[in-house]
Amino acid sequence: MAFLQQISGLGALERSCPSIMIGSSFRSGNGRVFDGRGIAYLGSREKFGFNRRRRVVLRVVAMSSSSTPFKMNLNEYMVTLEKPLGIRFALSADGKIFVHAIKKGSNAEKARIIMVGDTLKKASDSSGGTLVEIKDFGDTKKMLVEKTGSFSLVLERPFSPFPIQYLLHLSDLDLLYNRGRVSFVTWNKNLLSSNLRASSQGSGNSGYAAFSSKFFTPQGWKLLNRQSNSFQSGTKKNILSPPISPLVSVFSEDVPGDGEWGYGNFPLEEYIKALDRSKGELSYNHALGMRYSKITEQIYVGSCIQTEEDVENLSEAGITAILNFQGGTEAQNWGIDSQSINDACQKSEVLMINYPIKDADSFDLRKKLPLCVGLLLRLLKKNHRVFVTCTTGFDRSSACVIAYLHWMTDTSLHAAYSFVTGLHACKPDRPAIAWATWDLIAMVDDGKHDGTPTHSVTFVWNGHEGEEVLLVGDFTGNWKEPIKATHKGGPRFETEVRLTQGKYYYKYIINGDWRHSATSPTERDDRGNTNNIIVVGDVANVRPTIQQPRKDANIIKVIERVLTESERFRLAKAARCIAFSVCPIRLCPKS
């Protein structure tokens, strides 16, 4: 167990620094290794501090996760408080018990660590020794019965900020969820909360009838929801679930007198106004679980698979193959057990293919996108229903689907982009798709593109103010038609030239002297002259070499335009050449 200690009265929080072991592989559901690395925390050191001026000592401990060795859940923490706690708990329809509000001036507020939305995981028993797992409403009520003494609570902080603004507008009517409206009869006592179970075991079968849904365990919730068909799964296609699950009940300690309850030591109204201003921006909330959308009958796109139950839900939806672009380190960072998910895929007979792409890396996406589309085409040709996923579902997975529609179905990039973004909330890297498109066409054209320009290049010269700067090169009428650079202020001069795919030599003429730039790559020509060189675009390959380009002061931007009929034909040919370079049996590039 790794510890994080905070002593009341000290000015700083002492943090442990765990070691990191790198090297675990990231495997596909059928046992094939594609790429990716994993991390495991090996250990940490604890530090203690004391303040003799204060009687109350607050101890905060970061708890290790479950029984898995050498790992810890940094979202979990333990805090010891005196009674009364001053915490109002809420039970949500998904079976979670979380902090609903904190009383002003209470011990919980003085701790300055507990936040609204933190899930209650464990609590110490009446003797104050053993930590007991909180599974249901009954376990929490047992803890709240005690009037005095100190209690240790283990809480878990959500990955994403809890939507406190929705709690502010809830009324008493919102807490009448299913209260007395649905009866539940069972012979299985394990479906009821702990405070309703008999202490002695009977010889016969006893029946139970419940009219308030707050007395269920998570297992009972799941059974009730399936029978009543009222449960809207977090993976429901094209439907955004509410930010928080409906509340079943709200409860706290029985303390005489009234007190003011709050949601934190910050101006909530200003926070809500800031959230309103940010509406329309995409943000990933891992706590909402896996989200997906149906694009076609055979293609689904969405966020990452988090649990084995997600695999079961996908299998029930008819998914037979998963194309995953999330890396092993990403999965570790989000607390996802990749091995258990791969095992669940094998159990459900769902093919899992892992091909990691770096998140928010336009260059890595551009280089790997052709093979991604090739893998997707191979899966579709084998009559698979494919779920394309990454971490958020906003970028890499949706970019793959858009590129597939653009390259394989002769749909324009604009139409494919609008179609996918209209069905699934996402914002893929559109320039990366356009850049990969020209790389594919260049593959058929032997690295060159004869036709309308494909890229816009801004040539940059850093010299002295007052200089006359001219640009000359392969693209200026065979070095005979110099282009005058524009002074942008200070030592910076710029010239924008629209070029086709290819490799170009160039130089600058500064006040009549021919010179090359020291801030851009250089190369000697056949005559021994040192020239600057720029490579516009690249050639797609089924085995991409992910080598970052050399540092260059010049700026290259891709041009997105409507393809000519000849370009569309060459694009379709190149994309299928990549796809046919993928082995249909092993689903990896042919040797």
Swiss-Prot record:
<dbReference type="Pfam" id="PF16561">
    <property type="entry name" value="AMPK1_CBM"/>
</dbReference>
<feature type="transit peptide" description="Chloroplast">
    <location>
        <begin position="1"/>
        <end position="61"/>
    </location>
</feature>
<keyword id="KW-0119">Carbohydrate metabolism</keyword>
<keyword id="KW-0809">Transit peptide</keyword>
<protein>
    <recommendedName>
        <fullName>Phosphoglucan phosphatase LSF1, chloroplastic</fullName>
        <ecNumber>3.1.3.-</ecNumber>
    </recommendedName>
</protein>
<dbReference type="GO" id="GO:0009570">
    <property type="term" value="C:chloroplast stroma"/>
</dbReference>
<dbReference type="InterPro" id="IPR036034">
    <property type="entry name" value="PDZ_sf"/>
</dbReference>
<dbReference type="GO" id="GO:0005983">
    <property type="term" value="P:starch catabolic process"/>
</dbReference>
<dbReference type="GO" id="GO:0009507">
    <property type="term" value="C:chloroplast"/>
</dbReference>
<comment type="function">
    <text>Starch granule-associated phosphoglucan phosphatase involved in the control of starch accumulation. Participates in the regulation of the initial steps of starch degradation at the granule surface. May release a different set of phosphate groups from those removed by DSP4.</text>
</comment>
<keyword id="KW-0904">Protein phosphatase</keyword>
<dbReference type="InterPro" id="IPR013783">
    <property type="entry name" value="Ig-like_fold"/>
</dbReference>
<dbReference type="InterPro" id="IPR029021">
    <property type="entry name" value="Prot-tyrosine_phosphatase-like"/>
</dbReference>
<dbReference type="GO" id="GO:0004721">
    <property type="term" value="F:phosphoprotein phosphatase activity"/>
</dbReference>
<dbReference type="GO" id="GO:0009569">
    <property type="term" value="C:chloroplast starch grain"/>
</dbReference>
<dbReference type="InterPro" id="IPR014756">
    <property type="entry name" value="Ig_E-set"/>
</dbReference>
<keyword id="KW-0150">Chloroplast</keyword>
<keyword id="KW-0378">Hydrolase</keyword>
<dbReference type="Pfam" id="PF00782">
    <property type="entry name" value="DSPc"/>
</dbReference>
<keyword id="KW-0934">Plastid</keyword>
<dbReference type="InterPro" id="IPR032640">
    <property type="entry name" value="AMPK1_CBM"/>
</dbReference>
<dbReference type="GO" id="GO:0019203">
    <property type="term" value="F:carbohydrate phosphatase activity"/>
</dbReference>
<dbReference type="InterPro" id="IPR020422">
    <property type="entry name" value="TYR_PHOSPHATASE_DUAL_dom"/>
</dbReference>
<feature type="domain" description="Tyrosine-protein phosphatase">
    <location>
        <begin position="291"/>
        <end position="453"/>
    </location>
</feature>
<dbReference type="GO" id="GO:0043036">
    <property type="term" value="C:starch grain"/>
</dbReference>
<feature type="binding site">
    <location>
        <begin position="390"/>
        <end position="396"/>
    </location>
    <ligand>
        <name>substrate</name>
    </ligand>
</feature>
<dbReference type="InterPro" id="IPR045204">
    <property type="entry name" value="DSP_laforin-like"/>
</dbReference>
<dbReference type="InterPro" id="IPR000340">
    <property type="entry name" value="Dual-sp_phosphatase_cat-dom"/>
</dbReference>
<feature type="active site" description="Phosphocysteine intermediate">
    <location>
        <position position="390"/>
    </location>
</feature>
